[in-house]
Amino acid sequence: MSFFDMFGPMFDPEGGSNRAGRQNPRKPSNDDPIILNVETDGGDGPQPSSNVPPKRPSGPRITSKPNRPRKPSNGSKIFIGVVLALAIVIGLFFALAQFVTDVMWYSQLGFQSVIWTQLGTRVGLWLAYAVLIAAVGFISATLAIWARPDAADGSTIRVNGDTIEIGKSVSSKSARRIAVVISLIVGLVFGSQFNANWSEILLMFNSQSFGTKDPQFGIDNGFYVFVLPGLKLIMSAVSLLLLAGIIFSIVTHVLMGGIRITMPVNGHGLFRITKRARRQIGIWLMLNMFAWAANQVLGVFSHLTEEGSRITGATYTTVNATIPVTFIMAAITAILGVILGLWIMKSHTLEGSAPIAARASEALKAWKVPTVAIASAIVVSLVLTVAWPVLLQRFRVNPNAQEMESTYIQRNIDATRAAYGLDKVKAEQYKATTEGEEGALADSAESTAQIRLLDPQIISPTFKQLQQSKQYYTFADTVAVDKYDVDGVSQDTVIAARELDLDGLDNRNWVNDHTVYTHGYGVVAAYGNKVTADGQPKFFEAGIPTQGKLTDSEKYEPRIYFSPNATEYSIVGAPEGTKSWEFDYPTGSEGATNTFKGDGGPKIGNIFSRLLYAIRFGSDQILFSNRVNSNSQILYDRSPKERVAKVAPYLTLDGRVYPAVVDGRVKWIVDGYTTSDAYPYSQMTDLGEATKDSTTESSDTVSSLNSKNANYIRNSVKATVDAYDGSVDLYVWDQSDPVVKAWEKIFPGQYHQLSEISGDLMSHMRYPESLFKVQRELLAKYHVSSANQFFSGEDFWQTPVDPTESQQAQQRDILQPPYYLTLQTGGSSEPVFSLTSSYIPAGSSTREILTGFLSVDSDAGHEKGKIGSSYGTIRLQELPKDSNVPGPGQAQNNFNASADVSKELNLLESGSTNVQRGNLLTLPLGGGLVYVQPVYVKSSGSTSFPLLKKVLVAFGDQVGFADTLDEALDQVFGGDSGASAGDAENVGDTTDDKQDAKNDDSADGKTNTDGKQDTPSNTDGKTGGNNGDSSGTMSADLKKALDDAAQAMKDSDAAMKKGDWSAYGDAQKQLQEALNKAIELEQ
């Protein structure tokens, strides 16, 4: 059976085979079917056609008649059809449910333009390209059908000795129908690939000027970032259209007889192209070659972002060989297209039948023009694109590389600094001393008083044990560092939100998971530089209900419905007058309840909405539960980062989301970046690799950026997500960024302007960590401003590995993270909240000395709508090349090598306790660099938590180790540092250390499957965790244990000063016993 025997009935109601049997001998016309030959080995080859068509065989001539399979019955056909129809309907309904609920979600947030713009663009591109490719295919096929010869035989192939026809007669009308169907199928398939690049098209039509031009062609950088990617996409689409056109043309001509190919039989074969077919194919070929040439021209501009062995961008060989050759090859490609196209259109040697040997001989003569043209183009291409650049690089550039590449290296330096925001770095020489003198910190008293001792990663378990209250709450495994005004003084603060953790529930069911336990409660904040006498964080905001310095406002809303840990959907809202069933917070009885009053999610009061969400989440409870009522809302996609990613999918989001109390509400702050990989000459960087460090490797809360190459980045957007109602606000932060300006045009009304940021919110806008990590990665090389010095690479630096990590992690080059600290650096008149890091020499040298200290001012100020003047100022303090200031790794080694430190740490680690070393901070103080590292002690019990017990300090090669930072600083600065670190009060009687916030007593508050609260087993009003209050409510046993611990600490200090290590060991043992007793009583 031939191809058209099978598919002919789809286009001819009477069937192709019946029509063939009715055919009468007459002069063929344009609508006559084409006769395709069926030959055997015994024939003499194809015979010339005559006016009377030969009788057509019903199929290929074969020796045995195959058994035909039984046709399915009508009942089976109907059943299969019904099943397929149901599957399609169900699939469409599920897709509809997903789409409609997405529209409801975006509409509720006020970002419906995002989904409609995306959908409209993607569907529009898909349909436009599908129509174009279908139109091209249809036109190409129609032209080929129109050009069919008046009389023609078909083409044949030979299979296993039999000559088989590859087509059967078909009318022009049927052929057009086939062309329409195939064209549409091809168009829809390739159109779906084209719509994925919707953002490039939108940016091209909303392009902005950068105001700077590339140094090679003098074109505005906006052309490369916005226009060029779109042009490349369009040219790729055009190339595919033209390729489809020529393929449709050739295939249709073969089927219509315009091209006839018969396999050789007894040495005879046939290859023939009609004149009209030659013209069409020649034109299509020229168009394809022109498109190829245009793509080559566009490729020239890509050389400016091409990654080389040393830099990104066009180097000497590229500029002087590759780029000119590309223009030459584009011209050659276009000329070759003309030559080949004209030859095909005018050649008369492609007709007639002849033996294969004769045909080969004729072909060599007849095809001389295209053969010579193609061969010449290949030779020229090899010489120009391969040999010439290699020879130029080998014999001219390499021997004089520094001189010949300096211009292009300088271009790379300048462009990289501009693209990464490094062009305004304030660098200064810092001649650091390593000799600590008495009173050296007198001029740095304010910075010294703000040195943060609490490690945000180590103290997370402490937060959980002291403030979690119940097992269904949790805190981030790395708490955030921010600053707050407490009693009129700016304080470095560690802060975390008490998030809901459904995994902690004992009684998991649909009612509890989705209607009862719906939210977390409040934030917990502690001083960054203060602890209690027993080493616990000193909270100034804590407890349930929350009390403290941050939430004394009556309008404070503590409930946390939206948070990184809220992964399940919740259904909230109840009719007026109905008793609340949402669990609010634990109390001494059944627990307080609450009903959500905000506008946080799509309303699902009607049956249609409930049905849609039941399908989306695969839960019939949404349809049938009484908890779903006319006032119900469904909250989902509750992670702040996820919400911002959905409303601004074109942004790259920072790896850390942090909470802040702003104007009486808890807000999650998310930093958004605009990026590009098309900034001319700027160095390409893998953002994922550049933002990895020890924190991202060990934390579930903090992550690196997604791995992708970029050579331009700006922190253009600050986003906030309200923890209560999930509302998202996007603020244009960098108003000079052309990329965010383009997105503002694409999504008008989506952004708030800088002037709309309140003063309270402004005070919590920090310089983002991921951007700083990318910048420090680049600045390790690009602090070098001279092309010649850059070429030598002798002054390149690197970020040190984290010396507090395990040996295995250090071998994997896990980098030290940057740290937020309040300090005073060169050029600043007073201490500034800053993000800091340090540098050591690049390479594998074992001598790890400090080469530079990097900081960026992270305080955005507190004025409404105005960013602080120093915010974002990057300061680099470069140490002299002959400096011997230890780097972080060497400082850690000095700590480890100290006999006194090792002895005390061994004593602390004896028994059932473990020592944990906190973050190693580097601070420019006292004319040099001070290293500060808190030391925590943690017992081995499952409910234990780290307590700050000691502080390590290093200055030069001098090491201090004491109970407080004050004492440790005094040890390395001649007995008196001249400044107070503010933590001397941390050592003393625990009865004098009162927390600033209390935890209300709470019960389990579990809920049964029917939604009613279980009667709590703990009804004595006491919580299972520390309430942060060491006042009169403390039990007598607990007070005695803490008093014993305080006395043991005093005995330890006295023994250490006398050098009586035996007494010191006894005191430490007593201290551990007292702490274990206190912890046991606390639990």
UniProtKB/Swiss-Prot annotation:
InterPro entries: UPF0182 (IPR005372). Residues 1-72, 976-1061 are annotated as: Disordered. It is found in: Cell membrane. It comes from the Bacteria. GO terms for cellular component: extracellular region; plasma membrane. Signal peptide: none annotated. Keywords: Cell membrane, Membrane, Transmembrane, Transmembrane helix. It is a multi-pass membrane protein. The keyword Membrane applies. Pfam families: UPF0182. Residues 991-1013, 1050-1060 have a biased composition (Basic and acidic residues). The chain crosses the membrane at residues 78-98, 125-145, 178-198, 239-259, 281-301, 325-345, 372-392. Belongs to the UPF0182 family. This is UPF0182 protein BAD_0641. It comes from Bifidobacterium adolescentis (strain ATCC 15703 / DSM 20083 / NCTC 11814 / E194a).
